[in-house]
Amino acid sequence: MVEELLSLLHALLDRHQALCMENHQLLKQLRLLVCERARLLRQVCPPSCPVPYPSRFSGESGRLPEFIMQTMSYMLANEEHFCNDAMKVAFLISLLSGEAEEWVMPYIESNSYVLGDYQAFVDEMKQYFGWGTDDEDDGDDDEEEEMEEDH
């Protein structure tokens, strides 16, 4: 019985040694493959962003819709860099200048909650700088009222 157990133990030790050697060879191959992959990746040029970098916004209300669309498109095309609302708001702030830059300073100084809430930040911008379609909607209402008065 003891001899059978010793024989079984030797067989297990031999198998263990063979598996360790195989594991060592596989790790060696893996290291070579990782190095080869890194070498090949260095040769590949990353694709350029299909969406141009947005222009700065200085506070012209007529440009706000264009600015928001440009920044949204850019963030969608580069979403790996804009993983949360705070990153999106920080990106918008980095593109502000002039009156718009002055407007955002109190939010930054008071560490306002809108700095971490993209939609709230955009809503604040719309409220302060105006949104181009609001003026157009008012004009349409006036035209409808004039048409009703004529009939």
From Swiss-Prot:
Example GO biological process: cellular response to lipopolysaccharide
A Pfam family the protein falls into: DUF4939
Top-rank taxon: Eukaryota
Keyword Nucleus annotated: yes
Disulphide connectivity of cysteines: none
Subunit record text: Interacts with NOD2.
Function: May have an important role in the development and/or progression of some cancers.
Family: Belongs to the LDOC1 family.
CC annotations in GO: nucleolus; nucleoplasm
Record localization: Nucleus
InterPro entries given in the database record: DUF4939
Keywords on record: Nucleus
Species this protein is from: Mus musculus (Mouse)
Start-end of Acidic residues biased regions: 133-151
Region annotated Disordered, chain positions: 132-151
Record protein name field: Protein LDOC1
Residue ranges crossing the lipid bilayer per the database entry: none
